[in-house]
Amino acid sequence: MILRHFGFILIILTVYLSSTHATTRKHHRRSIDNDARNLGFQFVMEPRRNVTVMESSSHLLECSYVLAHERLVHDVRIEWKRDGVLLSERTSSRIKVMSNGSLWIESVSSAEEGTYQCAVHVTTKSDQTSDTWTFLSRKATLRLADLAKFELQAIDRTLAKGQPTAFHCLINSKPTPTAVWLHNDEPIVNGGEYHILPVSNTLEISSTQSRHEGTYRCTVEGAGKRRSSQTARLTVTTETVSNELVFITTPRLQVVEQGDEFLLECLVASLIRPQVRWLKDSRQIIVDGVRIRRVGVSSILVSRASIEDTGLYTCRASNNDDSIDRAVSVEVRAPPRITTRPTTKVAVETADVELECGTAAARPEARVNWYKNGEAIIGSEYFVIEPNRLRILGVVRADQAIYQCIAENDVGSEQASAQLLVDAPDSSSVAASSGVPMTSSAPLGLRSTSSGSRFINVEWDPPVQRNGNIMRYHIFYKDNLIDRERMINSSSTSATLTSLQPSTMYLIRVTAENEAGMGKFSDSLKVTTNKEQAVPGKVASLTTTATGPETIDIRWSPPSGGQPALRYKIFYSHDPLEKNEKETLITTSTTHYTLHGMDKYTGYQIRIEAEGSNGSGLSSDTVKVRTQSDEPSAPPVNIQAEADSSTSVRVSWDEPEEESVNGEITGYRLKYKTKARGAKGNTLVIDATAREYTMGNLEPNTQYLIRMAVVNHNGTGPFSDWVSIDTPGQDKEERTLGAPREIRPHAGIDYILVSWLPPADEQNLVRGYQIGWGLSVPDTETIRVTASTTQYKIARLHSERDYVISLRAFNNLGSGFPIYETVRTLSRETPSHFNEDSDSDDSDVGSSESTPVGVRAEAISATSIRVMWTESDETAFNTQYTVRYSTAVDGNQHRYVNSTETWATVEGLRPATEYEFAVRAVASNGQLSTWSMATRNRTLAAPPSSAPRDLTVLPAESGDPHSSSLHWQPPKYSNGEIEEYLVFYTDRASLADKDWTINYVAGDKLSHQVSNLLPKANYFFKIQARNEKGHGPFSSVVGYTPSGGAILSGKDRHNARGHGSAASGDTVSLVDQLQSLLHSNPLYLILLAAFALILILTLILIIMCCWKRSSGGGRKNGYQSGKKTSAGAGSGGGIGGLGGPPNDLWINGTGSHMRAGASDYMVDGLATAHLTAADIESPTPRYHHLQGQGTLTRSYHQSSQSLEGRQRTPQVVYTGTGRHQPIQRIDFESPYGSSSAIGSASTPPLPMQAPPSGPPTVIDGYRTLRGTPPNSSAANALRSFTQLAGATPPPPHSAASSSSRPTIIAAGGRQVPVGRATAQPRVNVANIYSPFASCSASSDAGESDKKSGECMEMRETTPIKSNTAGSSNGEKMNTNMNPSHSAEDLNAHLENLDTMLDDLQQLQHNLHFETSMDK
């Protein structure tokens, strides 16, 4: 038992010692840092890359180094090469190698020009071997300085006074020569009016004057030489210069080296000095004044150029009218720079070694060459040269050397080196205590399982004696005719040898490795690869050149080896490769081909295969190329304009699709103008990085048209359609915003579509909206949108969750009040709300049929939408589909379309209408699937199919007779958003539509004012609507004749509108028509004068008859006329104050239908009061008249001077009580707004009698009211009078009633007391509606000696005063006046007068008709 334990411990100790010894062996291996063979070579000084020296001068090319380990160094030798040829001091006495390795050249001549390189040879010796290591420096180019010829010289110039100009003096030489300018052979001093630009030596004059005329030339000195330019003459004229932009100098194409400076010239002439900006690759250059500074008038100088300065530079000059661009490319060339250097390595024979050499970006692109001990390496089967990498396969002892990568281009070169040390395979092994080796035995049974022309598969069995764990197997193989052996590793007992040569015998052997190292080798296996069919090799010298925006030229050379090529296959695709894109194949038999129809400014990758009789050979390397740029082919998209204030508009847009830009965007061109005909447009050029721009200094209350185009280096693309925007008349205020008026959410499974209406206060400025949402709480997430946005889709939500949505508007004062809405997203089992309907066919829905997925709708036209979907069941057969669609316009009424394909076209839709679609599958057995998720889309717009409605023409609100106001309603079928209305008008209806005058009105306006109309001329109006697709039909023509009267005041216009004086839009007043008719027909003037004379005589006759009857003493039971007093103090009671009894005919001698002067307010026993139009504003009638009270209806048009167009005065209503009444008061504070609603507050209405329905509304030429005596019936009233409808009945006669003061109710805010009223009032409407109404009152005959009447007169602000003279005069008249014998006589006269007025009205209609016919 003890022995067994002892044996176990011994075994463990043996294994531990073995592993310790193996570890010790590994640790004793030499480190590269401590290896004496590692020289640690490094160049301290290398020759400069490019050197320019003066002829016959001396120059030193430096070359010095250091060695980290010199113990084994035996000798160091330095050599110089010129253009790859070794230099010797023996062949040239002017060349000498210094002790530190530098090269000294004396008296440099053209023979010494070339490329120089230093080579350092280091020889080391050890006990066994001697090795030579060679290091190469970078290359240096030596050139002689020279003064080249002029590239640009001064030319004659003639220009206007005050314009800038420039003269060139360009020589491209190094070093840069010095220049001197001469004006009339006198030197010019730089500064002030003259600017001599650096680098190019251009002379600029910022503002030419007469003193600048003369000759100009420059003299240049450099490289020991001197040159003079040609002489140019400057002529200054006094001609007027246009505002057109013209380039004087433009930037030129330049290639500069890193670290140098370059000048970009740009000088532009115009009437007004333009603004000049510089852009680099569409971004504006910031002139910092240090590295980039402005020189001259508008040129820029860039110092210390770097690769980042390479690009396209654009000089952009602009003024208010236009802008011009001139672009030029600048290439900054830089020498290569090695970023990843190869490292010194120690390798074991048969191993593979990789050396990396990575370079940074260089212009032009650097070439990397590999050198072994100063000799160029040519790629082979064992030296594989890859980009930035060198692979050495199967390292042998001869591969030990210095490996260098040298990157070089036309500017310079850079080198990096590494030392490769090669050791023999490690043969040491670990022996056990018995002396038996611990490595494994040889693997057994090595065999080949398969082989081809380029590969061999081998297998073997593990060794019998493993002596530990087998860590890996090493497979060695080599060409039977070559000593270089290669090795690969495998962790299993099989391997595949690749990259072999066809028809070649290979020797293969295997060994196993355990903890002690590699074991014994197996016996070698000989395997011969198969013969390969002869195919062409790779094509050589593949080059691609973009010859245009859509063409690429491809050229190559035939393959150098293999079978001859019969044809070539060209493969090309986009770079980078688009999704699911495949290469395009073109076959050709020539070694060049031109691709046509390529995308503009698009990258492509191209490769070529040569094809022989046995198939295609290896593909060439892929070459990338980009087609040339071109002018943009599309304008910006999503252009929106929004008024920021009354003088500024903010425009926003998105860049077009990338494939339509055709280059790099350098800016956006924005044109804007007013909508007025012949308006001059303005042009702005905006930076390419901008997505919005604010235009300022605009006119308030003006409509502007805006359109945009994309600008690139090739020019300006097409402009967009005009976008209209109206600036407000006044700036909106920024106050705290109210909540949006409405929020309408629409929920889906994982989204919520939110739409809203803006706040109600349109005068409050809204700068945007903030939308917030969250699960059960608002504002967990928020986003802000612009003020013009009224819809937003909230995506990436969870299904079947309650979300609280908040919406608030904001401006500079902050966020306004929010509005909230709670919405629940849909369930995934309920794809859309279509499943919630109650259609009968939904009852048959089964679950066995799969639901269509991926439903999408694509608008085809204005009346059709194509619906497409994907069948989710790939095994479905003979399936039919039902498409259901609806729109909110029809109340979401469902309609259906059937299809047997996975698409359907729905026809007969409304233009510009959003529809919702869902699809379900119908199996052959009749089973139905559930409805798919709903999708929405909108049909395309179409021109309006109906005209604007209800076109109405009214007088202008301002009262201007030269203007009219048009009102209309939108078309019933607009077929899209109305962009504008076209108002056509003319004074000749027979003209063609193109000859009518057109006014353009924004689509959101429904009214427009037309100005500059001629009074009394017939105008015809019609209107047309336009949307984005075109114009709609015309509305019906509406005629209108502007009046020629004076401009009415605000109150008069209100009265005129209220009584139809101009409301019809196609009529004029009677007076205007008569005036027009009389001017054109003198005969009518004679007839009218005769008629007026007859009318006057008739009136005189009637007055005389009435006077005789009243003075002759009539019957006692006759009609008792009321007494009245003249309106004016001291005037008589007759017509015109002549003293006779006043007439009661309501017609004066001026031809008006109602008296315009001071008239009677005929109430017995009352004094007279005057009311002016300025005192009382005419109220809108609130009560209606009753035709049943004997109202005589008159229907004819009124002039602007008629009584109906004048200011109303309060009406007096009497209570019907005793003759003695308290003084009435006019209540201007009454809410009734009418002077006809009269009565005491204490007077109750009659039982079962409706309240007053309104005053007698005057819609005719005149209307008269007269009270009815208490003892007479209403039916016995005169035809020319009417009893006040619904009059308040008389209250009981008592002290209370006698002490109450009746009130006249009117608007105006004052209570005016008037005279007393009798129980039988007689009211004359001529007085009520006269601007100077009078009221008179006289006491009864029995009371004439006790109390006299008072006459009150109202003026603008003067209180009513009693008219004593008028009162006494009235009493005298009352004493002398006899009562009328009969009321029937007066009625007869009045009936005759009514007949005459009817005849006058008929005459007026006849005259109007004849006038219309003449026109």
Swiss-Prot record:
Subcellular locations according to the entry: Cell membrane
CDD domains: FN3 (cd00063), Ig (cd00096)
PROSITE patterns referenced in this protein's UniProt entry, alphabetically: FN3, IG_LIKE
Domain Fibronectin type-III: 442-532, 538-630, 635-730, 739-830, 851-944, 947-1046
Pfam families: fn3, I-set
UniProt-listed Gene3D superfamilies: Immunoglobulins
Name recorded for this polypeptide: Netrin receptor unc-40
Regions of compositional bias (Polar residues) in chain numbering: 1188-1214, 1232-1243
Region (Disordered): 612-658, 830-853, 940-970, 1112-1136, 1178-1274
Family: Belongs to the immunoglobulin superfamily. DCC family.
Extracellular side: 23-1082
Lineage of producing organism: Eukaryota, Metazoa, Ecdysozoa, Nematoda, Chromadorea
InterPro entries per UniProt: FN3_dom, FN3_sf, Ig-like_dom, Ig-like_dom_sf, Ig-like_fold, Ig_I-set, Ig_sub, Ig_sub2
GO MF annotation list: netrin receptor activity; protein domain specific binding
Ig-like domain span: 41-130, 148-235, 244-331, 336-421
Record's signal peptide: 1-22
GO CC terms: axonal growth cone; cell projection membrane; membrane; plasma membrane; receptor complex
Keywords: Cell membrane, Disulfide bond, Immunoglobulin domain, Membrane, Neurogenesis, Repeat, Signal, Transmembrane, Transmembrane helix
Cytoplasmic side: 1104-1415
Membrane protein topology class: Single-pass type I membrane protein
Protein's organism: Caenorhabditis elegans
Cited function: Receptor for netrin unc-6 required for asymmetric axon formation, axon guidance and cell migrations. Required during axon formation, in response to unc-6, to initiate, maintain and orient asymmetric neuronal growth, and may signal via phosphoinositide 3-kinase (PI3K). Mediates axon attraction of neuronal growth cones in the developing nervous system upon ligand binding. Axon migration is mediated by the secreted unc-6, which promotes attraction of neurons and axons through binding to the unc-40 receptor, while repulsion requires both unc-5 and unc-40 receptors.
Subunit and interaction comment: Interacts with netrin unc-6. Interacts with eva-1. Interacts (via fibronectin type-III domain) with drag-1.
Bias type Pro residues, positions: 1244-1255
Transmembrane segments: 1083-1103
